[in-house]
Amino acid sequence: MLPRASLVSRLAIVAFSFLLLLASLFTSGCVSSNRPAPASYTAASFSVPATDDGLPGTGPIRRADWFQKTWHDRRTSFAATAQQDQGSVVFLGDSITQGWGDRLVPSFPELHVSNRGVSGDTSRGVLVRLPEDVLALNPRGVVLLIGTNDLEEGAAPEIIAGNVKLIIESLRQHDPAMPVVLCAVFPSSATKKRPVDQIKRLNQLYRTIVRDQPQVTYLDTWTLFANAQGDAKSEEFPDLLHPNTIGYAKWTGALRTIFATLGFVDTKSDNFQPEAGFVSLFNDHDLTGWGYRPTTAQDIESAKRWQKSDPAAAAWPVIKDAVNFDHLKATPDGRFEAINGRLVVTSPHEYRKIQQLWTQREFPRDFILKLEFRAAPNTDSGIYVRGPQLQCRDYLLAGPYKALKHYKAGDWNEIVITVKGEAAYCTCNGEVLETAMKVPLTGPIGLEGDRGQMEYRHIQLKELP
């Protein structure tokens, strides 16, 4: 006869295998993904598997007494709310996600959200509990932050990234159209066994994972929080691991920019009307009046030099013929899209990709151009003024104007560009960016996409006498 402990362990493995089979049926389409969670959900065993035998993924799963209790208690509570959490936006991760606590719902009042964070969890632990805790909810979307505890346990970044890739593949198999926001692992400290070089390597691998996953948006929450040395700031992470209220507020702002593009928040246009004497360059509804222009010989040569000298250089597609996007909501690849009154430069799956959208019209007369922009963390975009580019970025993180005092991270900021002759005077929220940027005597207005997501709105121009 088997010892009792061994028998219990084997029964737990059998039960876990059965749950994986149920999840497989859901993701393969044998069972409708729209049906509610199975009645047996609450009867499942939520104990940490006794061994790694037969478990998906690789790397550490914690089994300390405190973690086993946390895992069991949290997952039992998840089962109790499985029905009411159907179709929610799921926040998935470890103690940082669990730490949203009572902040989560007020942070996103427009959304039905559910918290599936388990303190102490690892990427493999998330992979193990994914079918019951997440897939069974048929989520509207998933926000994933995981990996920091794996590093503390000594797992190599490649092991962690492999598990995250499996998580993303499982989510895609369940619902290919379901958006996933993959958050970069937050900065911490070598004193927490989470050195900056390991975190940076892991986030680099995460960016690689999403290149062939169009439903996944990578959100640079590392740069959002890192200090000059690449570690957590004590004023936002008192223990150098978990964010405080300030940290969660910054994370909220970063997520809201992405949620707006996904159609989760900011779902209505503000019906903007241009100021007296101004005309709108963007009609709030589609890309009429905008298009692609042939890539210049100078840009083609710049791209070749950059890509030859730097393996990490941005992709830079060459446009051979002009293309107009009148009456279209988006460009064919979705990089530029009209969404609820905003002209959005979406985050590229390649992480960096140089693309340019231009007005079909050119502007030979002096003018004042006004617009507002909202940047996701560390975004790099730009505004072309008759050709030359004014950098438009998440300035405090991405530069070049890091000393701005009135810039509002994660919120709307106003750019005003006054062109007279061959000089452009440029401000952001009233602060001077450029006093005399040299521009040609005529040319179009353009928007650039490089890294991250940028939203533009209220794009209006007034020609001067």
Regions found by a protein language model. Give the residues of each.
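Catalytic His-Asp segment of secreted/periplasmic serine-dependent ester chemistry enzymes
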Residues: 187-266
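Carbohydrate-interacting regions of secretory-pathway proteins
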Residues: 165, 265-465
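Oxyanion-hole/transition-state-stabilizing segment in secreted/luminal serine hydrolases
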Residues: 97-114, 123-165, 170, 181, ...
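Solvent-exposed loop/turn segments at secondary-structure junctions
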Residues: 95-99, 119-123, 148-153, 186-190, ...
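Structural recognition of the beta-strand scaffold that forms the well-ordered cores
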Residues: 89-91, 114-117, 141-146, 179-184, ...
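N-terminal secretory targeting modules
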Residues: 1-92, 97-102, 107, 137, ...
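Acidic/histidine-rich helix-loop elements
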Residues: 57-66, 101, 109-125, 152, ...
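Charged, glycine-enriched surface loops/patches
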Residues: 161-183, 201, 205-216
